[in-house]
Amino acid sequence: MKAFSPVRSVRKNSLSDHSLGISRSKTPVDDPMSLLYNMNDCYSKLKELVPSIPQNKKVSKMEILQHVIDYILDLQIALDSHPTIVSLHHQRPGQSQASRTPLTTLNTDISILSLQASEFPSELMSSDSKALCG
């Protein structure tokens, strides 16, 4: 009778793993810098793919995400307005379409409103408006 260990032996370099190009990757806890570089690569790829992002200008990650959201919404609108899709929606009545305003538009509107509110003479504003704007 042969003695064997209850613990499975681990082979470090399996031929099948090498031939398939499979390698054990480190977890983000093992290498936090690789995770950071990977995220930066993802942001760079998003910057390349979204046509409204200026390529020759440095933009923040937040701006990239806002452009991506706007682009997705624009694609959704284009898809929803495609004749084939429109005819499918007419076949299924009773479903409402929720249209969203892009975040950049909302942010711009809020900025404009706050600037306009600061230009009003204080005697024209109610106490509620002063609390909201001030």
Swiss-Prot record:
Transmembrane segments: none annotated. The bHLH domain is essential for its repressor activity towards the CLOCK-BMAL1 heterodimer. Keywords: Biological rhythms, Cytoplasm, Developmental protein, Nucleus, Phosphoprotein, Repressor, Transcription, Transcription regulation, Ubl conjugation. Ubiquitinated in a ASB4-depedent manner, leading to proteasomal degradation. It comes from Sus scrofa. Gene3D superfamilies: Helix-loop-helix DNA-binding domain. CDD domains: bHLH_dnHLH_ID2. Residues 23-75 form the bHLH domain. This is DNA-binding protein inhibitor ID-2. Interacts with GATA4 and NKX2-5. Interacts with NR0B2. Interacts with CLOCK and BMAL1. Interacts with IFI204. Interacts with NEDD9/HEF1. Interacts with ASB4; this interaction promotes ID2 proteasomal degradation. The keyword Ribosomal protein does not apply. The modification Phosphoserine is found at S14, S25. One of its GO terms (cellular component) is cytosol.
